[in-house]
A protein has these predicted regions:
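Short, active-site-adjacent cap segments at secondary-structure transitions
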Residues: 17-18, 240-242
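Acidic, Mg2+-coordinating active-site environments of NTP-dependent enzymes
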Residues: 1-69, 87-106
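C-terminal helical cap/extension that packs against the catalytic core
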Residues: 11-33, 126-129, 135, 170-231
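Nucleotide phosphate-binding/pyrophosphate-handling subdomain across enzymes
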Residues: 58-179
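Active-site-proximal loop/hinge segments that shape catalytic or ion-binding/gating pockets
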Residues: 237
Length: 254
């Protein structure tokens, strides 16, 4: 991917990963622009109230340039990192003579849509659909739910592939959700069995869990047992998120 004389921009901060990027860029003779020295940001979390999103905001600094504060349509501090990287790319393109007006930047950041990425449905309870399928994304999910959503009972509807770091994800979820319902994707050939997930859960948490392999029944049960002032979070795999998104209108009021 890294090509000679083509700028490389990254907000990766993991030392091992960044070292590989730096070494590869140096060998290719590609200029590297990276955080935190050349790309940094301040994040003001958004908030969801009564099903309405109050946008998060990012204030980015790239190439020694201070950008205006922009609203973001996507929730989570990781999206502020992504937006800052976008702004760094915009700067590079502008330096090459490509005209990108500030209004276009503002519109793009405020109107980006990414299905099943902290996607919010309903009001009582709120339903949050996400694709977290490893420990790192599970941690970001929990942190964002804690910072941007109302306080209240939280239910997890979870299905995942057998080859994922399931115990690592459970370590992030264990202290956050009051109860968990395990199900599985109909279309994933690697979907873990709900009863196996429940067994693993019992090893890391004393909180109650339930198993229902039929997704439609699991969805109905999760909604019925989540209080109106609560949050139902559905996550674990792209397969599961896609299936839930297709059936969700059947369970929510028009």
């Amino acid at each position: 991917i890294i090509k000679p004389a083509v700028p490389v921009l990254t907000t990766v901060e993991h030392p091992e990963a960044l070292n590989v990027i730096m070494e590869t860029a140096e060998k290719a003779g590609a200029r590297l622009v990276c955080s935190p020295d050349q790309i940094s940001w301040r994040y003001n979390p958004g908030e969801v109230k009564l099903g309405t999103l109050l946008p998060s905001k990012v204030k980015a600094f790239t190439h020694g340039r201070e950008w205006p504060e922009f609203e973001l349509s996507l929730l989570g501090p990781h999206q502020a990192s992504n937006a800052s990287l976008v702004l760094a790319c915009v700067h590079e393109l502008q330096q090459q003579g490509i005209a990108i007006p500030q209004e276009a930047i503002k519109y793009g950041l405020a109107n980006t849509q990414w299905l099943a990425r902290m996607e919010v449905f309903g009001k009582s309870p709120l339903v949050v659909l996400d694709c977290a399928h490893n420990r790192a994304s599970a941690k970001v999910l929990v942190n964002t739910l804690g910072s941007s959503f109302p306080k209240g009972p939280k239910t997890l509807l979870f299905g995942v592939s057998v080859d994922k770091d399931i115990k690592g994800m459970f370590a992030e979820f264990g202290q956050f959700f009051e109860k968990v319902l395990f199900t599985q994707s109909l279309y994933s050939p690697r979907a873990a069995k709900p009863e196996d997930l429940a067994h693993l859960w019992s090893q890391v948490s004393q909180k109650p869990s339930y198993s229902e392999p039929i997704l439609e029944k699991a969805m109905a049960m999760a909604l019925e047992t989540t209080p109106p002032d609560g949050i139902l979070c559905v996550t674990g795999s792209v397969f599961l998120a896609g299936e839930v998104r297709s059936i969700l209108p059947n369970y929510l009021p028009v």
